[in-house]
């Protein structure tokens, strides 16, 4: 039977549950046999206990991902959500493998850390796509707001101009971590092969010390840009309850990083000195970090299940292929296009050329064109854009509405632009009305 059959949403979930049960039937006896065969020590016990948490984590995460695929009604919002949800199983399985095989821990851990940069970027895209749908004139909304000063510790820096400048710099601040992290990962792998990496050892002779500093500065600035972006547009983002989502992303990224640094400090101070079955005390630190992550990912899976729930997107979906839904999850053409666009904008700035305006009079040409254009959309995105109205916009609290008209850039009545009209005086007197009209026209 072809995968495009209309009832695939009915059998895909039981199939996944059945496959997981079969995996347990095969995997658990193997783990028990392995435990009995080997000499049971601290390393083996830690690996077995961590495996129990992995087995509890994966079904929770995969169930949330599967539900989003079944109810894939708003691709521009659900695609980044699915990418974020994949963080938990990737972290969990990666850490479990690294715990079992310490010799390859450096390689699997660096791949895991690269994905965290990808997650931060996709969370930013999720917020931007929601705001773009709800407020097509997002730059106008920002310009109508009071000037936002920088947050500590950058409060002494000149503020970023409200409008497309702030949008560009916040997005670039997040995007730089997506580029810096893979670059430092490649450098770390090269240093490991040449024997100068020294993971977990704070020393001026080891490359690990410098890469940790670079990654930390890049990561902190990316999270700072996210916080600043949220603070400026807090009112507009309230319907999707972003605080819980932000905390889920921030806690996984920050806690995993700082606990690795804290464990390395304990090793350096001599608090952790016993090696047990490991070869070096640094391997003990890496194994402890991987074990803790396996436990933490179970808690993160539960938090992600409720924070990034599929329920607001449950509605009558268009008939589509399960194969297309699956491929849409892996499509990264929007990321490639967005990175290329940001690199070109940075190049224009460095060369002193005028940067391309993101939010101009043409609603088809803006900062998110590369993200939402037909050339980079997945098949499900293209299918959802066939009707004249959008596929629906997340308004929060489990409610999804479908506007009857297509939003355009002309969301403010023309009389507001007339200097002779009384509405124009009202517009000058109260700039906040522009923001309300621009963001609430889809709710009417």
UniProtKB/Swiss-Prot annotation:
Say if the entry is tagged with keyword Transmembrane.
yes
What the entry lists under SMART domains is as follows:
Solute_trans_a (SM01417)
Q: Where in the cell is it found?
A: Membrane
Q: Where is the composition biased (Polar residues)?
A: 368-378
- Which keywords describe this protein according to UniProt? Membrane, Transmembrane, Transmembrane helix
Tell me yes or no: is Transmembrane among this UniProt entry's keywords.
yes
- Protein name, entry field: Transmembrane protein 184C
What gene name is given for the protein in this entry? tmem184c
Its annotated function is as follows: May play a role in cell growth.
Return the Low complexity bias intervals: 399-411
Taxonomically, which superkingdom? Eukaryota
Bilayer topology reads: Multi-pass membrane protein
Q: Where is this region: Disordered?
A: 357-411
InterPro entries in UniProt: Ostalpha/TMEM184C
Q: Which residues cross the membrane?
A: 15-35, 46-66, 84-104, 182-202, 210-230, 252-272, 284-304
Q: Which GO terms describe its molecular function?
A: transmembrane transporter activity
- UniProt similarity note: Belongs to the TMEM184 family.
Q: Which organism is it from?
A: Xenopus laevis (African clawed frog)
Query: Cellular component terms, GO, for this chain's entry?
Result: membrane
């Amino acid at each position: 039977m072809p995968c495009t059959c209309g009832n695939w949403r009915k059998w895909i979930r039981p199939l996944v549950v059945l496959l997981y049960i079969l995996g347990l039937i095969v995997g658990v006896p193997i783990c028990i046999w392995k435990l009995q065969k080997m000499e049971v020590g601290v390393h083996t016990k830690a690996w077995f206990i961590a495996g129990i948490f992995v087995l509890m984590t994966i079904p929770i995460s995969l169930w949330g991902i599967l539900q989003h695929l079944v109810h894939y009604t708003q691709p521009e919002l659900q695609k980044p959500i699915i990418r974020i949800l994949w963080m938990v199983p990737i972290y969990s399985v990666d850490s479990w493998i690294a715990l079992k095989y310490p010799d390859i821990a450096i390689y699997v851990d660096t791949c895991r850390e690269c994905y965290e940069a990808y997650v931060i970027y996709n969370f930013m895209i999720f917020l931007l796509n929601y705001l773009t749908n709800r407020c097509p004139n997002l730059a106008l909304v920002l310009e109508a707001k009071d000037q936002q000063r920088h947050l500590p510790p950058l409060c002494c820096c000149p503020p970023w101009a409200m409008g497309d400048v702030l949008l560009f710099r916040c997005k670039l601040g997040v995007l730089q971590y997506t580029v810096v992290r893979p670059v430092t990962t490649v450098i770390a792998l090269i240093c490991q092969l040449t024997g100068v990496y020294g993971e977990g050892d704070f020393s001026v002779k080891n490359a690990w010390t410098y890469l940790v500093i670079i990654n930390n500065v890049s990561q902190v600035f990316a999270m700072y840009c996210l916080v600043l972006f949220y603070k400026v547009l807090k009112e507009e983002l309230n319907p999707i309850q972003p605080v819980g989502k932000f905390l889920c992303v921030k806690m996984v990224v920050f806690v995993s990083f700082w606990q690795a640094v804290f464990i390395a400090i304990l090793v350096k101070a001599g608090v952790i000195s016993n090696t047990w079955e490991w070869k070096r005390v640094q391997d003990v630190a890496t194994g402890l970090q991987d074990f803790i992550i396996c436990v933490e990912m179970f808690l993160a899976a539960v938090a992600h299940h409720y924070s990034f729930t599929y329920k607001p997107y449950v509605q009558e979906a268009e008939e589509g292929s399960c194969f297309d839904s699956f491929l849409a999850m892996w499509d990264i053409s929007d990321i490639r296009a967005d990175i290329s666009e940001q690199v070109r904008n940075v190049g224009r700035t460095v060369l002193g050329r005028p940067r391309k305006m993101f939010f101009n009079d043409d609603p088809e040409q803006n900062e998110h064109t590369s993200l939402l254009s037909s050339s980079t959309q997945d098949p499900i995105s293209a299918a959802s854009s066939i009707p004249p109205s959008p596929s629906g916009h997340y308004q929060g609290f489990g409610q999804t509405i479908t506007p009857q008209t297509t939003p355009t850039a002309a969301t403010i009545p023309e009389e507001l632009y007339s200097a002779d009209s009384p509405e124009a005086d009202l517009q000058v007197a109260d700039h906040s009305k522009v923001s309300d009209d621009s963001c609430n026209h889809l709710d009417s």
